[in-house]
Amino acid sequence: VDKRVIFAVAGAGKTTYIVNRLSRGKRSLIITYTNANYNNLRKKIIDKFNGEWPENIELMKYFSFLYKFCYRPFLSDRVKAKGIIYEPNSNIYLKESDSEYYITPNRYLYSNRLAKLLIKMQVVDLLKERLIKYFDEFIIDEVQDLAGRDFELLEHLMTVKMDTLFVGDFYQHTYDTSRDGNFYKKLFDNKSSYEKRYVDREIIPDNYTLTKSYRCSPQVCEYVKSNLGIDIGSHRERKSDSTIEL
């Protein structure tokens, strides 16, 4: 079983890397967060397979994965939700043991607490079995955008006995999929402690494969490395007359 998290730099070609490893002989589930990256992945996968979408590959946006793959098979009959609402619960006095903590009065699940509901209802082991049943590898692109309750669920799923690949840029953490008060508030304060969360669950960190950028010039990479402490190189050739204006 190959279990890795690749820490990529900006413009390193992480989407291309993921697509290049896909084949018709392996059942792959790919999860991504933003619409832009979903569309980019979809286009590149179709291009790779000569204009066709291979039946053995499933590409899902994160909340579709949570709702359709994780929630529906195990909890739809018990919870009877109508869908997801993408705004926080305004009632700060509810406890995790209250059903209203997770769902609105008109039966819409709070997106930032759906992952927590799956954990609370003890379906994580069933999710792992479902992943293994339908897929040979589990891939998450933009993994740096999973935070809060969603990262808590990811920590549970990290231990699934199958090939897993997580790819992301720690320093491009932009979105918080499940901001929920102070829960995991300091998750991205320190890269070493963030990386350790993967290591503790036997995920091998890879800080080498995607550390050169196609987007940034050597001069820009040197500036970022010197001033921000980010280990980034460039695939581009140095131009002697290049300057950086600040």
Model-derived features: positions:
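The feature marks helicase ATPase cores and/or their adjacent C-terminal helical subdomains
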Residues: 1-246
